Amino acid sequence: MFKNLIHCFSIKEDIKNFKEDLIKECINQRKEEEGGCNFKVQTKYMDTLYKIFIDCAKKILKPFTIKDKNFKVWCYMTDSMYNDTGWHNHKKSATINSVIYLQIQGKGISFKQGNEQIYFKPNNEDMLIFPASLDHNPEPSTKDKRISLNLELLCNESEKEIFNV
């Protein structure tokens, strides 16, 4: 059921020169407030991250054109203080979704479609690409910082066309 929906790439070589700086940007920009797990990050690496995302997506998906190039990078960071999570999707803001795992702490992510559910355990420096409408639930860390980034593409084509499902 999840075939052709979830794609995993190791981007270790692509981000090795700036990964630690990117983690520092995330930690420094985290808002100390309730629900501080998700926040928008202003990063000098945004163009590079989106280039990696788009290049990988073009390798495995059907041709697509980007409708909105007003790109954003969101950070999901959990630890002993902030570890809220829940099922969600990105269908209101995107067509293609990507998660980049910077510091995973051995935690994974669950995906759900209809009555089917799978659990996936990515590695540090992995990037997942999947349809924005696919429900998912990240596994939070309740100790050390778990840091991942969310990137989205809003396309002119439908998910069905792009993911060939």
Identify the function of each model-found stretch.
Residues 68-140, 144-149, 154-163:
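Catalytic core of non-heme Fe(II) oxygenases with the double-stranded beta-helix
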Residues 1, 164-165:
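C-terminal end-of-chain micro-motif
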Residues 1-68, 84:
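Non-heme Fe(II)/2-oxoglutarate
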